[in-house]
């Protein structure tokens, strides 16, 4: 990621293969815990490799960065096709590195892809993997897509017992997963 960015270029097919295997930090909270002696090398390596902002975001993402298995994604696309969807504006509101874009069936390739990812590392990887997609690296609550713009929204929204601040939806007191569903439907 950093090599491509420092050289201001797209990722090669080999680099894309490597980058597409990134699955976030959801399964590695111990790597961010300095009190875990068995993880001390990984802890230090992360501190050395990541900027302060990247490190803080990666540590925070251990709470909800869980990626969707390809078989689930394929099944979701099969349902869409069975319902008659062929092309249109597709939103992935919490995209990680874009696994849903990577498994987009051939029959849906005429669609325009839009993605949103809060985590900087995941979002930057997604931009390298899918340069033709419109990807925003920010919280979903900070996007300003017009209502009724998307034909389909697909993905695996974050789940948790915490809320997102968005004036348009604050009155509903949604937990994060409910918020994502409500905003996506609008």
Give the predicted meaning of each segment.
Residues 1-186:
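Class I S-adenosyl-L-methionine-dependent methyltransferase catalytic core
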